[in-house]
From Swiss-Prot:
GO molecular-function terms, A-Z: rRNA binding; structural constituent of ribosome
InterPro entries the UniProt entry points to: NA-bd_OB-fold, Ribosomal_uS12, Ribosomal_uS12_arc, Ribosomal_uS12_euk/arc
The protein's role, per its UniProt record: With S4 and S5 plays an important role in translational accuracy. Located at the interface of the 30S and 50S subunits.
Name of the protein in its database record: Small ribosomal subunit protein uS12
Subunit structure: Part of the 30S ribosomal subunit.
Family recorded in the similarity comment: Belongs to the universal ribosomal protein uS12 family.
Organism: Methanoregula boonei (strain DSM 21154 / JCM 14090 / 6A8)
Gene designation per UniProt: rps12
Keywords, alphabetical: Ribonucleoprotein, Ribosomal protein, RNA-binding, rRNA-binding
SUPFAM superfamilies cross-referenced by the UniProt entry: Nucleic acid-binding proteins (SSF50249)
Length: 142
């Protein structure tokens, strides 16, 4: 590191060089979060339900959180999405078309006691899942 009276240019150059040691700077500059994101930077995505899965809650909680494996239509990637609400999983069947969005954990990660689940189901066959859970709407028959 230059320390002299005329060392400004070297200090600037070095600080630009050593920025790449910062993990967050490198991820931001190389756009890695969008590249690795299954939704490709979009707020929501549509997908087809492959199967229903129960995910065990982390300690100290004890529960089986009802989730679904979804294959996204736009790129074929598979993600796990949480079905929010009491009995919500009963409104979701295999091969249904669902809309998912991020679960809202910090830094785009999972939330609460559900490990490895980053998404929530918002609608099933173009009907809001919450509306079906509270009984305001019925699931359309195909």
């Amino acid at each position: 590191m230059g320390q002299g009276k005329f060392a400004a240019r070297k200090l600037v150059r070095d600080s630009k060089k050593f920025r790449w040691s910062d993990k967050n700077y490198a991820r931001r500059e190389l756009n890695l979060d969008v590249k690795s994101d299954p939704l490709e930077g979009a707020p929501q995505a549509r997908g087809i339900v492959l199967e229903k899965v129960g995910v065990e809650a982390k300690q100290p909680n004890s529960a089986i959180r009802k989730c679904v494996r979804v294959q996204l239509i736009k790129n074929g990637r598979q993600v796990t999405a949480f079905a929010v609400g009491d009995g919500a999983i009963n409104f979701i069947d295999e091969h249904d078309e669902v809309e998912i969005e991020g679960i809202g954990g910090r830094l785009g990660r999972s939330m609460g006691d559900i490990p490895g689940v980053r998404y929530v189901v918002t609608s099933v066959n173009n009907v809001c899942l919450h509306e079906m859970v509270i009984g305001r709407k019925e699931k359309p028959r195909r």
